[in-house]
Design a protein with these regions (language model features):
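Charged, flexible cofactor/metal-binding loops and thiol motifs
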Residues: 68-153
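P-loop NTP-binding/switch modules centered on Walker-like glycine-rich loops
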Residues: 2-3, 7-11, 15-97
Length: 153
């Protein structure tokens, strides 16, 4: 019996780039050899850009965006995804720009206690309105294959 799915949770975290490349190559070989899908759980947007076909972005244990990898990097819709991508150093921009990285303001929500209504990102979101604190946005398809959980769409 061969698996249909391999779940790899942070397989490249804290590895140097050489070992990271070897791990990713091994995962791709397994995928091709066994004809299985890989669910890659990572915070490394570079790894995502290089290896993923679809991306699911989560914030505070809630899915906030799902899209094909190219579309997500080209046009992220959720304010958290936008902030996440703006906070990544870029070599092509850093050499010619004095623009600083933009950290996401605020702190990560606690997941202790009962789940509260509202968008979990609302306390950190510059675009949040009162309704965002009281209602949880549904994940809805706003373009073919691109879903977002945000009342702005």
């Amino acid at each position: 019996m061969q698996p249909n799915l391999l779940i790899a949770d942070e397989p490249t975290t804290a590895l140097d780039v050489t070992i990271q490349a070897q791990i990713l190559e091994l995962l791709n070989e397994l995928k091709a050899k066994l004809g299985m899908a890989i669910m890659l759980i990572t915070h490394d947007m570079g790894v995502i850009a290089e290896t993923a076909q679809r991306v699911v972005v989560m914030y505070g244990a809630q899915v906030v965006e799902e899209a094909p990898v190219g579309e997500l990097f080209k046009e992220p819709l959720h304010p958290y995804t936008q902030g996440l991508l703006r906070s990544i150093p870029r070599i092509d921009v850093a050499a010619t720009s004095k623009k600083k990285l933009e950290p996401i303001p605020g702190t990560v929500p606690t997941l202790r206690g009962p789940e509260k209504p509202g968008c979990r990102f609302a306390p950190r979101c510059a675009l949040a309105k009162p309704m965002h604190f009281d209602n949880t946005p549904p994940l809805k398809e706003v373009r073919p294959g691109h879903k977002v959980a945000c009342f702005l769409y």
